[in-house]
């Protein structure tokens, strides 16, 4: 029986949100280098404000990249093709302030090292999370927030909702039941959508179309009831959007990118970083581990933490927490992880095949929960017969007490 009920909320932003624009541009730069030089070292930040994009950071690569063309193509794809929408790919100013990677970092991390023993590109802590509340092993609050944005902009691109502009935000609150540490979605409590729009639609019509064509198309009917609350463009008109409305910067939507506030976050952003940066690759690996444990039925929820020191290949620590949803102890789960996963950066890169130009799509609707990404493919775990038998027993109590 459910132990208690609680509300939890996650948000998402569209590809036309200024911060997400910057994430996509940074990852497009990364992909352009990896396409020509799989060993490229890239740390590219993007800044945007009215009529301006600036690339800054450090890149060491054999690739030749036309940044002017690349940046404008990303902005065009997003849909900013006229200044009335907040940005125009044809007329914006693209500034480039990119330098080479520090030779001190290069010497300490990868120069003259075997590929398996490449050191971590920096110190830091990274987390992975998984939950059995959805098929994707992602929190439903975040999954629905992403899907609302995705549907809204599918309709914009198709012309069915031609009044929609590229910049939007969504937010979903769900009422959950806690069931022995697992989270069971009961109903959608609140939906928030704020979307940029053309001047020629009334707020009443906008709100009706959002309910009929977006919300009802995305959120399962059994999760909606007569008490569900809707805040649709609650601030009123939203005509001025994109970089004209707000400045944008790479790496400012790290909770949208990950688990929507569930689990934990180590603080490092992903976009614009090649996979020797453990902020990115180790966070992907931690998700791979957590999802593999949940999909194997070893626990219903899982949080994994890893930590590194710059230039050191082996993780300093690995932690597995199951929120009291596993018949195995945390020590048992950690043994399974250590037996099945090598979390040195070089091995993560090799096992997940991360030296490929696969990153721009990750910057659009979250880095997790999409089965086309290699870290979303659960590993078939090798588990001893004794451990397997033990895993069929009653769940172990939560003795650590980590929050949602």
From Swiss-Prot:
Pathway: Amino-acid biosynthesis; S-adenosyl-L-methionine biosynthesis; S-adenosyl-L-methionine from L-methionine: step 1/1
Transmembrane segment boundaries: none
Keywords of this entry: ATP-binding, Magnesium, Metal-binding, Nucleotide-binding, One-carbon metabolism, Potassium, Transferase
Residues involved in K(+) binding: 45
Entry EC no(s): 2.5.1.6
Cofactor note: Binds 2 magnesium ions per subunit. The magnesium ions interact primarily with the substrate.
Residues reported to bind Mg(2+): 11
Catalytic activity: L-methionine + ATP + H2O = S-adenosyl-L-methionine + phosphate + diphosphate
Covalent S-S links between cysteines: none
Cofactor field: Mg(2+); K(+)
Residue sites binding ATP per the record: 17, 167-169, 235-238, 246, 252-253, 269, 273, 277
GO cellular component: cytosol
UniProt xrefs under CDD domains: S-AdoMet_synt
Root EC class: transferase
Pfam families per record: S-AdoMet_synt_C, S-AdoMet_synt_M, S-AdoMet_synt_N
Sites where the protein binds L-methionine: 58, 101, 246, 277
Record InterPro entries: ADOMET_SYNTHASE_CS, S-AdoMet_synt_C, S-AdoMet_synt_central, S-AdoMet_synt_N, S-AdoMet_synthetase, S-AdoMet_synthetase_sfam
Note: Protein expression is regulated by post-transcriptional regulation: under rich-diet conditions, mett-10 binds and methylates sams-4 mRNA, directly inhibiting splicing and protein production of S-adenosylmethionine synthase.
Protein purpose: Catalyzes the formation of S-adenosylmethionine from methionine and ATP. The reaction comprises two steps that are both catalyzed by the same enzyme: formation of S-adenosylmethionine (AdoMet) and triphosphate, and subsequent hydrolysis of the triphosphate.
Protein family (similarity comment): Belongs to the AdoMet synthase family.
Name the record gives this protein: Probable S-adenosylmethionine synthase 4
Species for this entry: Caenorhabditis elegans
Name of the gene this protein is made from: sams-4
């Amino acid at each position: 029986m459910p132990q208690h009920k609680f509300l939890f909320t996650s948000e998402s932003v569209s590809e036309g949100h200024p911060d997400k624009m910057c994430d996509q541009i940074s990852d497009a730069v990364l992909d352009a280098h990896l396409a020509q030089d799989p060993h490229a070292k890239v740390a590219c930040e993007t800044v945007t404000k009215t009529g301006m994009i600036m690339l800054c950071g450090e890149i060491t690569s054999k690739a030749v990249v036309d940044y002017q063309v690349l940046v404008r193509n990303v902005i065009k794809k997003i849909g900013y093709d006229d200044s009335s929408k907040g940005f125009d790919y044809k007329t914006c100013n693209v500034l480039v302030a990119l330098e080479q990677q520090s030779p001190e970092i290069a010497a300490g991390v990868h120069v003259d090292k075997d590929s398996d023993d490449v050191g971590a590109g920096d110190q830091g802590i990274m987390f992975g999370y998984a939950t059995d509340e959805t098929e994707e092993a992602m929190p439903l609050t975040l999954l629905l927030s992403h899907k609302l944005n995705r549907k809204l902009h599918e309709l914009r691109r198709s012309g069915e909702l031609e009044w929609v502009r590229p910049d939007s935000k969504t937010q979903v609150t769900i009422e959950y039941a806690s069931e022995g540490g697992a989270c069971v979605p009961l109903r959608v409590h609140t939906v928030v959508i704020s979307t940029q729009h053309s001047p020629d639609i009334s707020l009443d019509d906008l709100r009706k179309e959002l309910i009929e064509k977006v919300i009802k198309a995305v959120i399962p009917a059994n999760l909606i009831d007569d008490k569900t609350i809707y805040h649709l463009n609650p601030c009123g008109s939203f005509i001025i959007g994109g970089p004209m409305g707000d400045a944008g910067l790479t790496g400012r939507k790290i909770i949208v990118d990950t688990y929507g506030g569930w689990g934990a976050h180590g603080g490092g952003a992903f976009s614009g970083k090649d996979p020797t940066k453990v902020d990115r690759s180790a966070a992907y690996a931690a998700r791979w581990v957590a999802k593999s444990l949940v999909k194997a039925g070893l626990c219903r929820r899982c949080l994994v933490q890893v930590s590194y020191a710059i230039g050191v290949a082996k993780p300093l620590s690995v932690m597995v927490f199951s929120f009291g949803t596993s018949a195995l102890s945390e020590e048992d789960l950690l043994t399974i992880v250590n037996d099945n996963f090598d979390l040195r950066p070089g091995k993560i890169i090799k096992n997940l095949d991360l030296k490929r130009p696969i990153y721009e799509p990750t910057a659009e609707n979250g880095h997790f929960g999409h089965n086309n990404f290699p870290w979303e493919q659960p590993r078939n775990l090798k588990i001893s017969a004794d451990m397997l038998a033990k895993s069929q027993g009653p769940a172990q109590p939560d003795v650590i007490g980590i929050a949602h």
